[in-house]
Amino acid sequence: MKKPLNKLEIKNLTFKNKNDDYIILKNLNLDINSDKVLFLLGSSGQGKSSLLKTILKQTDVIEGTILFNKQDIFQLNKKEWKSFLKEVSFLNQTTTSIPFETVFTNIVRSLQDYKNLFYNIFNLVSKSQKEEITSVLKELNILDKIYHRVDSLSGGQQQRVEIAKLMMQKPKIIIADEPTNFLDPNISKNIIELIIKMAKKFNSILIIVTHNVNLIHEFDSSILLIKNQEYHFYKSNKEINSNILDQVFKND
């Protein structure tokens, strides 16, 4: 039986930074489903990262709301909010791993069970968790690096470690903020393929922020373009052409 889609609904959203009165984006209406990746595009300073922060309640919302599977995230109590955050995972442009520790140890540290005192002191995982870590690394083609220090890996391999950590968490929402910013084109495409594959596996909503306009033509996706407090949504990347992109990134 097919799983129901996870869904993020943004309704009439207007928001600003907490430290000033500048309105970043006005009247945003958008549905994001787990059956299709959303690429978020815009030049620097247009509010892409601020929109992601709004999902985490880190900006001031003037109007509107965000629903996750029909539940208003701005109305969640403390316990419900904590539970929601466990469903959200981030992939950044730089590694969050501890460079002088091994791939395995970094993945163990990322497990939610690591907050348990037993894991914290003894750095141990269950047999099933170890088997899962091994399986994930094999799927990402870095099993041979399991006991290597993270700082001995290439940039692409380090991003695969970050993806492995996300796979262990099985998130319902994945936010990838410029995940291939420092990687060459071929590796960038491969990393995005892995992220999309992971999102499909876990039925996750996937939002990818990128400046790389070449990537959006490589994958079946929807596109949100942001510029000058306004947005344009395209249900398919096939609707995007070079003239549209030139306008978005003009003067960037």
Swiss-Prot record:
Superkingdom classification of source: Bacteria
Similarity annotation: Belongs to the ABC transporter superfamily.
InterPro entries: AAA+_ATPase, ABC_transporter-like_ATP-bd, ABC_transporter-like_CS, Metal_Ion_Import_ABC, P-loop_NTPase
GO molecular function per UniProt: ATP binding; ATP hydrolysis activity
Alphabetical list of SUPFAM superfamilies matching this protein: P-loop containing nucleoside triphosphate hydrolases (SSF52540)
The protein's name: Probable ABC transporter ATP-binding protein p29
Keyword Transport: yes
Keywords noted in UniProt: ATP-binding, Nucleotide-binding, Transport
Function statement: Part of a high-affinity transport system.
Start and end residues of each ABC transporter domain: 8-252
Species lineage: Bacteria, Bacillati, Mycoplasmatota, Mycoplasmoidales, Metamycoplasmataceae
Chain positions recorded as ATP binding sites: G42, S43, S44, G45, Q46, G47, K48, S49
